[in-house]
């Protein structure tokens, strides 16, 4: 059984838009260890599955109107109908992952994983802008519900099993 939690605040600037996303996420799932350890070792090469949820908000700082017959310089819009906060957003997705963890000291591991995500649902009803970024999922577009990421981790495993004293 595996769980991950996180929080994120990220401001992103592109050619046409500047926005800030802030929120938190939780991921719950399982890891299946595919590696048989030598005696005394506790390393992992694993496949995993996660169900994830994120609660977040967008803040559109400014954007540039795109016009095909642009003659003058770009007009940057920093106030008006489409700027400002888009609150109370949430999204759910599933993650498939492959990774490895190496024990560096007792109950502490260092590792990395490659994750493939598929967006299951989101509640973006906003007429202002579509989804741009989801904490824990990463970048989103209107045409694509898939994503990927590479993570490196430092993990502490809470020991739930204790040795019986004789």
Name each model feature, range by range.
Residues 144-166:
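Outer-membrane beta-barrel "beta-signal"
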Residues 6-23, 56-91, 123-131, 137-151:
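Extracellular/periplasm-exposed beta-strand and loop segments of Gram-negative cell-envelope proteins
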Residues 8-12, 33-35, 52-58, 117-123, ...:
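Structural signature of outer-membrane beta-barrel domains
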Residues 28-32, 49-53, 96-102, 112-118, ...:
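Residues on the lipid-exposed face of transmembrane beta-strands in outer-membrane beta-barrel proteins
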Residues 2-48:
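Hydrophobic/aromatic-rich structural module bridging two neighboring secondary-structure elements via a short loop
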Residues 28-76:
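Hydrophobic, well-structured mid-protein blocks that either form specific transmembrane helices
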Residues 35-44, 104-110, 160-166:
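Short loop/turn motifs that connect adjacent beta-strands in outer-membrane beta-barrel proteins
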Residues 1, 24, 41-45, 92, ...:
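Outer-envelope beta-barrel architecture signal
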């Amino acid at each position: 059984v595996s769980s991950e939690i996180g929080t994120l605040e990220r401001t992103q600037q592109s050619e046409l838009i500047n926005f800030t996303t802030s929120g938190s996420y939780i991921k719950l799932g399982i890891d299946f260890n595919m590696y048989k350890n030598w005696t005394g070792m506790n390393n992992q090469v694993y496949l995993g599955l996660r169900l994830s949820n994120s609660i977040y908000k967008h803040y559109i700082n400014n954007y540039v109107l795109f016009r095909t017959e642009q003659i003058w310089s770009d007009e940057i819009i920093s106030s008006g109908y489409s700027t400002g906060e888009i609150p109370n957003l949430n999204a759910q997705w599933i993650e498939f992952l492959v990774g490895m963890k190496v024990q560096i000291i007792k109950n502490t591991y260092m590792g990395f994983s490659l994750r493939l995500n598929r967006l299951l649902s989101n509640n973006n009803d906003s007429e202002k802008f579509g989804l741009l970024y989801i904490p824990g999922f990463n970048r989103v577009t209107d045409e694509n519900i898939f994503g990927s990421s590479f993570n490196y981790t430092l993990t502490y495993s809470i020991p739930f099993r204790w040795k019986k004293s004789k």
